[in-house]
Amino acid sequence: MTDLTTFHLPERITNTEAHRELGQAMVKAWRTDGIFQITLSKPQEQTTDEAFAESRQFFSQDFETKSRHVSALTYSGYIASREEVTAGEADYSEIFTICPDIGLEDARVRENLPCHGPVPWPGAAYRDRMKAFMGMLGTFGERLLQLIALGLDLDDMDTFTRLTQDGWHHMRVLRFPTVQSSENARGIGAHTDYGMLVIAAQDDVGGLYVRPPIEGERRNRNWLPSESTAGVYEHDDGWNFIKPMPAVLTVFPGDFLQFLTGGHLLSTPHKVRLNTRERFAMAYFHEPNFDAWVEPLEADAAVAPIHYGTHFTNMFMRCYPKRITTRRIMENGLLDKLPTLSELA
């Protein structure tokens, strides 16, 4: 277990010495611990608690009711325990994924662009509470990325936020079942997150472990098919338990920040162990636009740019090979609708 650095997030970010120093401290925390915390105000804590309450209510329902909320159009919706796969092994988490809520009348849906469609909400209260929580985290994400840009001494503090305009922000609402003994009880296998910035909330049960940067340890580039991070170092020493704390959120970098910074910031490996108590968590992903092409901050002709939407689609197809959404993409050849590198030239 490690004591995390905790920050207060300013309401507005400016290119001032104070905010540059704050950004530098955040970068240092990531390069040391792989993760840091930000504090919540009382109203923000209430918004978080209301989202957790809706999560508990939804997951308390029977499987038949929950499993109605799936979609062939989008990866939004219910994911049963053992449906998600990490490193070829089923995870025990039960999930409701919330991707951008795009109506059937939208041109992207009519054109059968992969992953686009309405969220199969379980109800209005769930929808409203989750959207309120995600909206709050969206404002956090923009400010955090501005601070990180300042902390990296970039000339423009909006270097990252230009990528996230109308971003493909999404959230995984998670429930972890109980086990007789929490010793080596896998909830989610070791992995890094495929996106840009992760902001997470957890209840008081505990189960999250992260792997900080370790000198001399090779870290894979998860965006490359030959360098998946799934399962890497899962059974090695060096993992830190993240103790649940009240009125805070945890923040860590995903694969795209590692890609953008040429490995100066490493995507944080993490895993979840089950507990003898039921556990709830929510992980929000602050992401580039679906159509964004992402290139390293320092130009490198040897490094190909990444199309975010193609990357997202490939990652979800890998995690959910048997899901109706994946089958529809494969059976209808919908990957052909996504850009290829040749189209960038």
From Swiss-Prot:
Which cysteines are cross-linked by disulfides?
A: none
What cofactor requirement does the entry state? Answer: Fe(2+)
Does Metal-binding appear among the keywords?
Answer: yes
Binding positions (Fe cation): H191, H270
Provide the reaction this enzyme catalyses. 2-oxoglutarate + O2 + 2 H(+) = ethene + 3 CO2 + H2O; L-arginine + 2-oxoglutarate + O2 = guanidine + L-glutamate 5-semialdehyde + succinate + CO2
Task: Please name the InterPro entries in this protein's record.
Answer: DIOX_N, IPNS-like_FE2OG_OXY, IPNS-like_sf, Iron_ascorbate_oxido_reductase, Oxoglu/Fe-dep_dioxygenase_dom
Does the keyword field hold Cell cycle? no
Any Gene Ontology biological process: ethylene biosynthetic process
Q: Which UniProt keywords apply?
A: Dioxygenase, Ethylene biosynthesis, Iron, Metal-binding, Oxidoreductase, Plasmid
Give the pathway listed in the UniProt entry for this protein.
Alkene biosynthesis; ethylene biosynthesis via 2-oxoglutarate
Q: Which PROSITE patterns match?
A: FE2OG_OXY (PS51471)
An example of a GO molecular function for this protein is: 2-oxoglutarate oxygenase/decarboxylase (ethylene-forming) activity
- In this chain the Fe2OG dioxygenase domain maps to 167-288
Q: Which Pfam families match?
A: 2OG-FeII_Oxy, DIOX_N
> What is its quaternary makeup?
Monomer.
Q: Tell me, in a sentence or two, what this protein's role is.
A: Simultaneously catalyzes two reactions, namely formation of ethylene and of succinate from 2-oxoglutarate.
Q: What else is known?
A: A dual-circuit mechanism has been proposed in P.syringae pv phaseolicola for the complete reaction, in which the binding of L-arginine and 2-oxoglutarate in a Schiff-base structure generates a common intermediate for the two reactions.
What's the family?
Answer: Belongs to the iron/ascorbate-dependent oxidoreductase family.
Q: What is this protein called?
A: 2-oxoglutarate-dependent ethylene/succinate-forming enzyme
